[in-house]
Amino acid sequence: MTLKNTLRPWLARRLTLLSWLALIAFTISQIITFWFTELFSHFLPHYTVLWAATAAVAVQRQRWLWAVAALAGGLWLCWPSGSPAVSTAAPSLKVLWYNVNLDNPAAAQESAAILAAAPDVVAMAEIDLDDTGWQTLHQAYPHGCEHRDNSPFALALWSRRPLQSCRVVMAETDAGEPFPFIEAELDGSSLFALHPPPPINAELAAARQAYLQQAARKIAAAKTVLVMGDLNSSPFSPVFRQFTHSANIRPHTPNYLPTWLPFGLNIDHVLTRGKSGTRIHALPWMHSDHRALLIEWP
């Protein structure tokens, strides 16, 4: 018996076991409303790769099952999000969303990269406003508002030109402290920057839920709206779907796009209502564990 003949069954058994566990975990995450099971919904890209690998080595009678699972996962990952891009004679509003990471070691370099992207509006989470490396960026974008905090919940929305309004809204939760989001208005359109707490325990998961519910009510009341943020939730999560339904907004970030390291999850989102043709460009990874999203909004 050759090494190849012994290795394939050994690999097939282990991949099959892992694939069953992944399939069960993902199915439960879509059915049971519980913060811990919801965590398993975010890893669909990883499950899809696993199912495809299992289909390649599994025994004949199981191969079709994992091929179908991989195909279904791949279709969900590649399913078009939002409205198709359309050409327009009017110039687009360029907005940049970026969770810059509270401990970013190179704020000056990040500022230069953002200036090179030349957005009209920039919204940032986890920004350390005491870091002088952000001063050049703030000077170029003097209008807007921010929530100053020495925590991951610092938040800023800055604009090159005057905004009609900009305010920090504190979402009340049972976690012992409120969490901020920003609501601004420019040219009659509403801009929202969100960063709810991560669901790493039951208390913070409930806080995220309360935060998203309060933000959804504000967003639903607006007419034309652009929402951006690190939502600490993926497109495959029932929590994410509930939020988009309650707020009556459509996601535009591609389902397959990784925006957060080290797990390569898609948790930074752009969502809109009232305009078609929104385009998203993911910028190269810099010094944060997130990547910036450049939004062209007609």
Placement of each model-derived feature along the sequence:
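Soluble catalytic domains of enzymes that build or remodel membrane lipids, polysaccharides, and related
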Residues: V95, N101-L115, E126-P298
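N-terminal, active-site-proximal structural segment of metallo-dependent hydrolase catalytic domains
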Residues: T2-L137
